[in-house]
Amino acid sequence: MDGRDIKEPVPVITDGRYLEEIYKLQKELIDHYIEIEHLPMYPINVNPKSSQVMIKDFTARVIEELAEGYESMVLIDELSRKNFLWFGDYSLDDLSQAINHLQNVSEEMADAMHFLIELLIYVNIQPEDILKYIKSSRQGVKIQNEKDIIQTVMYIGGAEETFNNDILEEELVQTTNILEKYLRIFGDDLDESNFDIDFYRAGSEFGSRIYKSFKKALWDVCYHLNIARNFLKNKPWKQSEMMTDEIRFQKELVEGFISLMGCYSILGLDSKTLFHIYFKKNRVNLFRIRSKY
């Protein structure tokens, strides 16, 4: 079962508060996980060893999901190069395979979002804290819509990742939208009730610049999350204890969130589409909980 199997309509968010709604939905899942996995109630004190083990586990889960999503992108890259970037004569079977890999990209990105939001909830970083940090750390950036924090952070993260990537000029030229190619060929035969188009948008615009930028952006997420982990000094084997520098710890987690939103921006997602794939995967997880999967 995956997000495509969920037929429940995605809630319409009219005020732009997608991030707040994601926090709400994630807390509903956590409340179940507290009972199933015997997790502590949120928020937690980050200093005890048990808390730090849990935090490091969550950061590892985020990184694992991102790696799985990137693995699908590597497969798309191989198929695209094999088929001359989908120009001229190309294999329709390979195009269908690429579309299936695109769907998995969205699934894994939604999973990464779940784990990072769960981590932020546990360490008591709220949406308003992220907005406050953005305002203080990016004072030269004009915020267009304070209510839509995801879109704001996507804009900032995406711009920073694009600016920081050294891409050759010739790599900026040719891109191909794999989803559009697929729909032009197979669109008339698709059952719209079983083809959730929003699950195929992430990474559908293929090009060297986009994929190289995404790979670099992934490292930025991993870097900030691992630097945050490094502030957690109370290893299970240590007999002495150290207080956590919580300001610097939380700063790195928020920077990791900004970089993750930059990744999603590079993939062509916006706040509405990200919420769509998050919600569908949220419902998959809720089904698994209720069915004792």
Predicted regions mapped to residue ranges:
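Flexible "arm" and connector segments at domain edges
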Residues: 2-293
